[in-house]
Amino acid sequence: MSDTILKCTTRHVRIFTAVVENNDLILDNGHLTLDIDPDNEFSWSDQSIKKVQDYFRELVELQADNELSDYTLRKIGSLLEDFIRKLLKDGELSYNPNSRVMNYSMGLPRTQELL
């Protein structure tokens, strides 16, 4: 295993081979930490967070027999990013109007005025 923290960073997903202790990442090759939407671009319900977490667990289990690598983490991160886009498109997630920046990174909101 690696002596450095492996990580995947997308716009809305961060995955680390680490645990969080006192706001610091501590290397732990037997543990993956998932940080969802670190910039709070979206308004999340408990149900939508659970869906992302469950899908994350499913993706990790599918990779259980493979060596953990940067590529594997990037693949999981990309699939989670696509899943979040689907939640937004399906209306299970919405943009956070109190977000620091409104950049609509996954496309304009689907409203009656824009359809």
Curated annotation (Swiss-Prot):
Highest taxon of the lineage: Bacteria
Membrane topology: Peripheral membrane protein
Localization per Swiss-Prot or TrEMBL: Cellular thylakoid membrane
One cellular component term from this protein's GO annotations in UniProt: plasma membrane-derived thylakoid membrane
Entry-linked InterPro entries: NdhM
GO molecular function: oxidoreductase activity, acting on NAD(P)H, quinone or similar compound as acceptor; quinone binding
Primary location class: membrane
Family under the similarity heading: Belongs to the complex I NdhM subunit family.
PANTHER family with a match to the protein in the record: NAD(P)H-QUINONE OXIDOREDUCTASE SUBUNIT M, CHLOROPLASTIC
Name recorded for this polypeptide: NAD(P)H-quinone oxidoreductase subunit M
Species of the source: Prochlorococcus marinus (strain NATL1A)
Gene: ndhM
